[in-house]
Amino acid sequence: MAGRMPREIAPGVFWIGDCLAQRHRGRIYHGYNAAFLVAGEAASALVETGHPKDFPVIERHLGELLARGVAPLKYLFVTHQETPHCGGLGRILARFPDAVLCGDVSDYHLAFPHYEDRMRWMKEGDAIDLGGRSLLAVEPVIRDLRTTWWGFETRDRVLFPGDGFAYSHYHEDGHCGLVAEEAVTLDLPDVSAVFADLALFWTKFADMDVYCDRLDQLIDRLGVKTIAPTHGLPITDVTLTVPKVKEGLKAAALLPESGTNEKLVLAAAAPA
């Protein structure tokens, strides 16, 4: 994937970061822990800071982009307090001493008390002005943690949904670094269902039709043109691709919860 990144997925919006490899169904199954740089006229914002292992890659990608002349990095927007999203936070704050962390900043002061003065709370509708474009905190329709916010870039209509469009891809099929519409052999409903089954367990106890309808309303209201998920390939054709992801979310909700299933199998196999 190294030759494809950083990749500009919308004007001034750059996809950076790396894959996390694991075995699944006998193949090398990759999940992204992506980050995105949104470059304005006066400042740039980094959305997510990546998995801890990815900091050297993210630092290199940021260096390449800054060397090209993008505006200085002044803001960090992390969707929520989970390692694949904020795992590079301390090192990014140290590397870029003028950067301010924005969003729901709950608990970060406990890990980084020396950076507490560089943390800025945001609520829905609050904006970060980058010059010529802004980054808004918007409703997190599908969230992992209570503290989740999604981000939305106003000029080119890019949505940053964190875990909201989470799905993996197959390394062996050359999907790394592609946008969703380029990965023609990727079964999006299937890989979306796998991710939701393993990571978003609450979807099994909710009416996902309601959540998917709410997602459609948000996309329509904001006029979203591009979707940049943390754990999936960027979506550049919203009308074509979003229905496939929703199909996977609804399918996963109908599957038995994996951990409970395994316990039942073990209990049934145990001697009386």
Regions found by a protein language model. Name each.
Residues 51-52, 83, 166, 234:
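Short, glycine/acidic-enriched loop or turn micro-motifs at the edges of active sites
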Residues 45-48, 75-79, 137:
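Short catalytic-loop micro-motif centered on adjacent basic/acidic residues
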Residues 1-3, 236-272:
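C-terminal regulatory/interaction regions
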Residues 7-8, 96-229, 234-237, ...:
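Metallo-beta-lactamase
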Residues 54-101:
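Active-site metal-binding motif and surrounding structural segment of the metallo-beta-lactamase
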Residues 4-64, 150-153, 157-161:
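Conserved beta-strand hairpin/beta-sheet module of binuclear metal-dependent hydrolase folds
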